[in-house]
Amino acid sequence: MSNTYNDLSTARLVELALARNEGQLASNGSLVVTTGERTGRSPMDRFIVEEPSTADDIHWGPINRPFDAEKFDALWDRVEAYIAEKDRFVSHVHVGSDPEHYLPVKMTTETAWQNLFGRNLFIRPDSFNPADKQEWQILNAANFECVPERDGTNSNGCVIINFAKRKVLLAGMHYAGEMKKAMFSVQNFLLPEKDVLPMHCSANVSETGETCLFFGLSGTGKTTLSADPHRFLIGDDEHGWGPGTVFNIEGGCYAKCIDLSQKNEPIIWDAIRFGAIVENVMIDPETREPDYNDVSLTENSRCAYPLEHVEKRVIENRAGEPSHIIFLTCDMTGVLPPVSILSREAAAYHFLSGYTALVGSTEMGSSSKLKSTFSTCFGAPFFPRPAGVYAELLMKRIDEFGSKVFLVNTGWTGGPYGEGKRFSIPTTRAIIAAIQNGDLDDVETEHLDALNLDVPKHVPGVDTELLNPRTTWVSPDYYDGKAQELIAQFVENFKKFDVADAIVEAGPKAG
């Protein structure tokens, strides 16, 4: 006889997860789990059902892969029959903290720990679905094995979104981040219809109520820089921006744990306690101490905790429109300035480009291994509509509110990776503080022609010699050569966008 457990408390879910051998309790009180062969998202296993009501609005391709509607129905029924014979966990949550723009979701999971994950990352409302909206369903059977020949999937696991039926199916997926990002993709499709820009960004607010957004790909400092002891956190990853509001799409944080320390990340460290989940981290068999430096399972170790675990947060989970918007890039070529001031068109250009640079090899070796990465809207895997839809909405929001936009390089200066040096965290924090304090809203600038960027001539607390990157290199000619290489990559990447000429003109210039 199988049981359905409805809307269990955190303590009960932890208790059942331990009783069912789904994880272990760490010395800090968190539940430690492993996710098997998948320790990150599986883009090749993510699909959107192709059906008439949404087919013309989705940007189909290697990211948004089509799935047959009849095959979806058959697989959903198969997974539902499978999970009906097991103990299962059901929770009722919201995705989106705005009273107008939330989605009510019935989440059914095969494991207790993934239900706890959903309750940590989504929003646990005081009353479920007060506006009586149409309900979405998540069906998550982690131990179900798909058969590609029978099910039409790519492998033994899948994530499939069906907009027409308001269903999200996860089968064979132990990595819980898939569930969070699937619902982000759902909101990223739906919100633009309501004049709301969905954003892959973190957000915080000053004590006087001024909101700041941080966009950036993994490793650029989004989570670290938004966790500011002098400001209140709204959220660390997913937000919507509509007329009069910035709201969190989530109710929790999903932070990277690699090399986590109390000294460097006190807010995250303190949030990992009873009720939090730690994913793919080794723990000592005797003391049960987590070892965040051990990457034998993955470098993508994570912790999932509710926002209640962050002391200095915005209780309502939303705030006013942003005074300041920061695009973070970790430029390992050393070409970009530490801070640039962007016009609305330049903001659209860099938003569409979504540039950062990674070391291509896992061995942090020579600078020849550098790889420039362009991820549209600073989160290409999660945006189902054509990119221009989001860029136009960004410019509209900036125009209507008058937000100031900045490009901040948290990467290298004085030369590429291996030759130059990384901007220190105090330097980056001084730049962020100057932006948030309004010190750069109206300042004298220098125009860098090739990059087509405006750089402030003075930033409080920052060495003026760092502001123009060309002057920090030993050889200006060497810098110019590297700059042209990077500019050529920007230009080549931007050819895929069909946007207004004014946006193209706001980008770097080859030659």
Curated annotation (Swiss-Prot):
Pfam families: PEPCK_ATP (PF01293). Its cofactor is Mn(2+). Pathway: Carbohydrate biosynthesis; gluconeogenesis. ATP binds at residues 181, 200, 216-224, 265, 302, 428. Its EC number is 4.1.1.49. Binds 1 Mn(2+) ion per subunit. This is Phosphoenolpyruvate carboxykinase (ATP). PANTHER family: PHOSPHOENOLPYRUVATE CARBOXYKINASE (ATP), PHOSPHOENOLPYRUVATE CARBOXYKINASE ATP. GO terms for cellular component: cytosol. Mn(2+) binds at residues 181, 200, 237. It comes from Marinobacter nauticus (strain ATCC 700491 / DSM 11845 / VT8) (Marinobacter aquaeolei). Belongs to the phosphoenolpyruvate carboxykinase (ATP) family.
